[in-house]
UniProtKB/Swiss-Prot annotation:
Protein EC: 7.1.2.2
Membrane topology of the entry: Peripheral membrane protein
Name of the protein in question: ATP synthase subunit beta, chloroplastic
GO cellular component terms, semicolon-separated: chloroplast thylakoid membrane; mitochondrion; proton-transporting ATP synthase complex
Length: 475
């Protein structure tokens, strides 16, 4: 950020991450302007949030306010926080201010953009809904993603969220020539580090040639002040917007975790003197969420498809934070611990995951019928499981036994080997087109493959591989 401004003020009050500054000249910075306290490595950047009157402004710090004191000089940069964008960001890790934090040298600042920008105009939006093919069978068939849509990713610890995220990053790069931006918002530093290491291992980040990497990472972790956690999502979004608007690419934007964005806003809200709203959240909750979510969309040039991990506090879906998030989502991908325990990966729950795209007028009759028949078979199997547990399979009618056999094949066929998991599964990854996916499930539902053993459907790509696997199992 260039320090061309000469508008100088002085700190009058510090309350945690909130700093009050008086500009004696009477020339006040605009809302969202970045102001800098100190210089060099110890410089503290704050963002103006309120104009208090009497030539004073209230700002929220993006870094720790330790060591600041009243009377210190403050410089108005006369512009919002700006971050680097473009190819130089790929393979690198940034903080909320767009500074690299991976000890791999500086990033070229040829192109920077402010993190506060308007959403695209109505005339620029792509209004025709289209499916974003991921190459992952269970997602494309049962809960398809909308191009330029927002997807909620729900799942506890250890059920495969990270691996699913990395596979999506890999597939968008290979199939769509797109890139991804990962925004780590208020999550554990250890998880951020693990993700970075796994991305290097699976070649999503190419260490020898960073420009060939498929992702840029932006972190504002749990130990950072609320100001950083509140704005890091916007930093990641700004980098994604450049790839969409200038490079005209399809972009995947991951936000982990969207709840922490709201949480950071509520921490700052009371310090800014706002009256708390329901459950202690900020009164501006819907506005803040809307200003972030409305920028995530498809334009006629490219698209940003966002996948947001959603933490649900105390599993209460009516809590204002997740409830506000739900109103923006086009699809939900729910990861199931039961499926993970069975070794079925990706552990996406086919009955709990939903999508607004699964409508006849969008996906067509064939896709819709296939998806509904798969869900119907799995639902019936779920209902029969109690009877099977108590009385055994032999007590079922012939028709029910056939449903159970097909449902078990469907369940296994919903599993799939991932490219990014080759390192630890030893089996090559598979990208399965939607046409191949539908062909396979229709053959199972029609009874064409009733004689094949169910293990031949486990961890394969398309249905031809399952038939080949069955032959090799027979030996």
């Amino acid at each position: 950020m260039t320090n061309t401004a000469t508008n100088i003020g002085y700190i009058t009050q510090i309350i945690g991450p909130v700093v009050d500054v008086e500009f004696t000249t009477g020339k006040l910075p605009q809302i969202y302007n970045a102001i800098i306290i100190g210089s060099g490595e110890n410089a503290v950047t704050c963002e103006v949030q309120q104009l208090l009157g009497n030539n004073k402004v209230r700002a929220v710090s993006m870094t720790s306010t330790d060591g600041l004191k009243r009377g210190m000089e403050v410089t108005d940069t006369q512009a919002p926080i700006s971050v680097p964008v473009g190819k130089a960001t790929l393979g690198r890790i940034f903080n909320v201010l767009g500074q690299p934090v991976d000890n791999m040298g500086d990033v070229a600042l040829d192109q920077t953009l402010p993190i506060h920008r308007g959403s695209p105009a109505f005339t620029q939006l792509e209004t025709k809904p289209s499916i974003f093919e991921t190459g992952i069978k269970v997602v494309d068939l049962l809960a398809p993603y909308r191009r330029g849509g927002k997807i909620g990713l729900f799942g506890g610890a250890g059920v495969g969220k990270t691996v699913l995220i990395m596979e999506l990053i890999n597939n968008i790069a290979k199939a769509h020539g797109g890139v991804s931006v990962f925004g780590g918002v208020g999550e554990r530093t250890r998880e951020g580090n693990d993700l970075y290491m796994e991305m290097k291992e699976s070649k999503v980040i190419n260490e020898s040639n960073l420009g060939e990497s498929k992702v840029a990472l932006v972190y504002g972790q749990m130990n950072e002040p609320p100001g950083a956690r509140m704005r890091v999502g916007l930093t990641a979004l700004t980098m994604a917007e450049y790839f969409r608007d200038v490079n005209k690419q399809d972009v995947l934007l991951f936000i982990d975790n969207i709840f922490r964005f709201v949480q950071a806003g509520s921490e700052v809200s009371a310090l800014l003197g706002r009256m708390p709203s329901a459950v202690g959240y900020q009164p501006t909750l819907a506005t803040e969420m809307g200003s972030l979510q409305e920028r995530i969309t498809s334009t006629t040039e490219g698209s940003i498809t966002s996948i947001q991990a959603v933490y649900v506090p105390a599993d209460d879906l009516t809590d204002p934070a997740p409830a506000t998030t739900f109103s923006h989502l086009d699809a939900t991908t729910v990861l199931s611990r039961n499926l993970a325990a069975k070794g079925i990966y990706p552990a996406v729950d086919p009955l709990d995951s939903t999508s607004t795209m699964l409508q006849i007028n969008i996906v067509g009759q064939e896709h819709y019928s296939c998806a509904q028949n798969v869900k119907e078979t799995l639902q019936r199997y779920k209902e029969l499981q109690d009877i099977i547990a108590i009385l055994g399979l032999d007590e079922l009618s012939e028709e029910d036994r056939q449903i159970v056999a097909r449902a078990r094949k469907i369940e296994r066929f919903l599993s799939q080997p991932f490219f990014v998991a080759e390192v630890f599964t030893g089996s090559p990854g598979k990208y399965v087109s939607l046409a191949d996916t539908m062909k396979g499930f229709n053959m199972i539902l029609n009874g064409e493959l009733d004689e094949l053993p169910e293990q031949s459907f486990y961890l394969v790509g398309n249905i031809d591989e399952a038939i080949e696997k069955a032959k090799s199992l027979k030996g």
